[in-house]
């Protein structure tokens, strides 16, 4: 009997879960929108929001902390040059989850997770 579910396991090991979240973070930073299952989108939101908050202040320490989580130089550069300055005045809530039906094979609920005001972000870049 699991009273408080602290971690959704997704039937994966811990390292596989971490790699999955890291890959989804990189994809969201580079593409501004991704399609995934609803539960994965909710987990991704928990991890990406603090990263974007830290990317609003461009210091070497923040760059190193984010690089330690993401381990992708292209996404770190994009975070600090485009996404961080774009969300500088916003106190939080950088992502939006939009439900988009069910997957054909297993009827899993699907969702788009996107950065808020992504059209303005794409025009700048």
Swiss-Prot record:
InterPro entries: Ribosomal_bL17 (IPR000456), Ribosomal_bL17_CS (IPR047859), Ribosomal_bL17_sf (IPR036373). GO terms for molecular function: structural constituent of ribosome. The keyword Ribonucleoprotein applies. One of its GO terms (cellular component) is cytosolic large ribosomal subunit. Pfam families: Ribosomal_L17. The keyword Cell cycle does not apply. One of its GO terms (biological process) is translation. Transmembrane segments: none annotated. It comes from the Bacteria. HAMAP family: Ribosomal_bL17. Part of the 50S ribosomal subunit. Contacts protein L32. This is Large ribosomal subunit protein bL17.
